[in-house]
Amino acid sequence: MPILRSAHSLPHKVIIKEGINMLKSQEVRKLAPEMDPLRMGMGWKEEDLTKPQILIESTYGQSHPGSAHLLNLAQEASRGAYEAGGKGALYFATDICDGMAQGHDGINYSLPSRDIIADLVEIHANATTFDGGVFLASCDKSVPALLMAIGRINIPAVFVTGGVMDAGPDLLTLEQIGKYSAMYERGEITEEQFTYYKHHACPSCGACSFMGTASTMQIMAESLGLMLPGTALMPATCEDLSVAAEEAGKTAVALAKKGMKASDIVTLKSFENAIMVHAAISGSTNTLMHLPAIAHEFSIPLDADTFDRMHRGAHYLLNIRPAGEWPAQYFYYAGGVPRIMEEIKDHLHLDVMTVTGKTLGENLEDLKKNGFYEKCDTYLKKTGLKRTDIIRSFDDPIGTNGAIAILRGNIAPDGAVVKHSAVPKEMHKALLKARPFNCEEDAIHAILTHQIQPGDAVIIRYEGPRGSGMPEMFYTTEAISSDPELSASIALLTDGRFSGASKGPAIGHISPEAAQGGPIALIEENDLIEIDIPQRILRVVGINGEKCSEEEVQRVFNERRKALPPFKSRYTHGVLKRFTQTAHSPMQGGYMD
């Protein structure tokens, strides 16, 4: 006689009927008699119909190097699921590439694409019932999109990231192309040199080999507990990644049989762990939009102030580009996420659950015993570097105040984001003259034609979520950071966002944005801008070049607001119309209703 268990002991939607614990897919199968013949029409065997059904969702497509190789990994995950007694079904939600969208209006689709991919995965998962899933992605919007979808559909889930591409000749990496483009525009390198750099910056598949948004979000996926330990940001060309994908398929079946949902793993403590790791790696500022958006799907409150609080006093350890010296493929060689966590484990919640069915603390102990670090060392030896050349020890950090700060003031009442670890020390406190522009194109032109001088604050507005979809200001930051005269003497302020490859004095996500009447819309030429990163201040302290009181600034702002024309979106149909009408503040995650 089978033993009946209480439904409350089954965290997944397991239906108890006639003494048998029935997976949801099997119950729905009885309600939809067409399901079996349709699956048999795809070549399924009769015994496959009764197995745990595993969604194998990837962003595979010939869209960019981060996704072009994911089909092989998805097939490995499906093979693993089959070997563990499940049946995988491959689904695809191809992503776009921010790099290919740069320099034209295509970049306006970047952030909206995150939400659209999450929607498509929700449709895939819920239109055909699955008992668990393996989710595969590599890059800026695809990783957070699938993590958002996991939170929304809340099934047993394992994440596999597509790893990182190799560096090119002389350790050339893609984020340097923006710098070389600006140098070419200024006549500092030849066309032949520029062409060589372009043709050799991406020698393999995988995410771009620097600590940009793609690499950061791969690390965040593991930090949340949804990946097998040590599998984030592996070299995309190594066999270890295929093995990890196969193992993920097996793990997804095990989680489905246990009924362990994603929400049983991802908690507020998980997000706090991810933020501490983010501080240690000096991760992309875009994480401040992606993690809150993911947390929203898990019904967990998370705001930008949590990042600011946790980054204060956090030790920054990672010597990887763009803030550091080495390409991102070396991160795995040095021990990857587990090595970072080992260094900061006194500041982590080690009792959080992970997809292994063990706690984070147990996983870290297992890795010390199973040869993981020794295997990483075999890769590292080929570089001639030591582990501490890549990941510093907690007692010998690169910095001791994290990487991110949230600034506030009469320009950004709801906040603005700066990666202070990438800002020259002389710009941590500055008084600058405002040079406002209503689009990025005009600002870039002014910089490249030497209209911007030391002591200026370049302000780019109407580029927030409600303005234009919140594109990246990558070329502007590269034009500034590659100019020796400007890189440590001016600042960029915007309600838009930055590429994870950006460096230099760049302050973004200014909220409220100009399109919603935020004070950034009221700034005029030669207003005086005060930046004080240690005190977390961003404000106008003078009008037309003359310092004045806060009350006088507010009086002038009130007068200017009366003359400010209402914002009119240029998008009248399609995705960008929907996004710019419904997107939330970047301080809340910039997600679309």
Name the predicted role of every residue range:
Residues 7-21:
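Short, Lys/Arg-enriched N-terminal segments with co-localized hydrophobic residues
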Residues 19-66, 73-93, 99, 105-110, ...:
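Catalytic or ion-coupling anion/metal-binding cores of large enzyme and transporter domains
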Residues 125-146, 157-161:
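A short, small-residue-rich loop immediately preceding and capping a beta-strand
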Residues 2-4:
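Position-driven detector of the extreme protein N-terminus
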Residues 110-119:
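Glycine-rich, highly charged phosphate/nucleotide-binding loops
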